Design a protein with these regions (language model features):
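The beta1-alpha1 cofactor-binding region of Rossmann-like NAD(H)/NADP(H)-dependent oxidoreductases
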Residues: 17-28, 60
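Conserved NAD(P)H cofactor-binding loop of Rossmann-fold oxidoreductase domains
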Residues: 46-51
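Active-site helix of classical SDR
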Residues: 78, 114
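Residue(s) in the substrate-gating loop at a strand-loop-helix junction
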Residues: 98
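Active-site loop immediately N-terminal to the catalytic Tyr-X3-Lys motif
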Residues: 56, 105-109
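C-terminal helical subdomain
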Residues: 131-134, 138, 154-193
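Substrate-binding pocket helix/loop in short-chain dehydrogenase/reductase
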Residues: 54-55, 62-67
Length: 193
């Protein structure tokens, strides 16, 4: 946050740390936003968790942990914020899925299952919210360089920059009210890892 305030000294930034994998904290965060008189124009559901493993041998509780973070966080936060968006008949929701939402891969067991579920949530939400002029975009990024890759040995130039994904979300959010990018698929130029 310090970096944002330094880079953009004229903006007002408020932050509230919450563990969105917990239903009560996700709901409380949504109410905090609404109680601070924020009109949510764009919601990016980006809470995520990855625990590698195969379905047959991953740690006990891995599926539950990833469903809690990767699906339920978006579900519970969105449900709190939707009534105000529906009343205004405007808004744009971005759900951060993954290439793992579209195809299975080795060592992706529970993670892939949770992201497939988030894709289903996103598709249903898009259908339900059309009458309210609320757009829903599902984002399917491949590998993007974040801190979690810093000790992986992977050359940062081999995978996407996180800013590439942010730029696509911003671009999609700037379209006219009549246009909705339903899905964004982004992959490293050299292909998936």
């Amino acid at each position: 946050m310090e970096e944002l305030l330094t880079k953009y000294p004229d903006i007002k930034v408020k932050a509230k740390a919450r563990n969105l994998s917990k239903k009560e904290e996700a709901q409380e965060f949504g109410h905090w936003l609404l109680n601070n008189a924020y009109n949510i124009d764009v919601l990016v559901n980006n809470a995520g968790n990855f625990i590698p493993g195969s379905i047959y041998n991953e740690a006990e509780g891995a599926l539950e942990a990833m469903i809690q973070t990767n699906l339920y966080s978006a579900y519970h936060l969105t449900r709190v914020l939707l009534p105000a968006m529906m009343k205004r008949k405007s808004g744009h929701i971005f759900n951060m899925c993954s290439i793992a939402s579209l195809q299975a891969y080795n060592n992706g067991g529970a993670y892939s299952i949770s992201k497939f579920a988030l894709n289903g949530f996103s598709s249903n939400l898009r259908q339900e919210l059309k009458p309210y002029n609320i757009k829903v975009t599902t984002v399917f990024p491949g590998a993007a360089y974040t801190d979690s890759w810093s000790e992986s040995g992977i050359d940062p130039k081999r995978i996407m920059e996180a800013g590439d994904i942010a730029a696509m979300i911003y671009a999609a959010s700037q379209l006219s009210p009549q246009a909705c990018v339903e899905e964004i698929v982004l992959r490293p130029q050299l292909g998936d890892l």
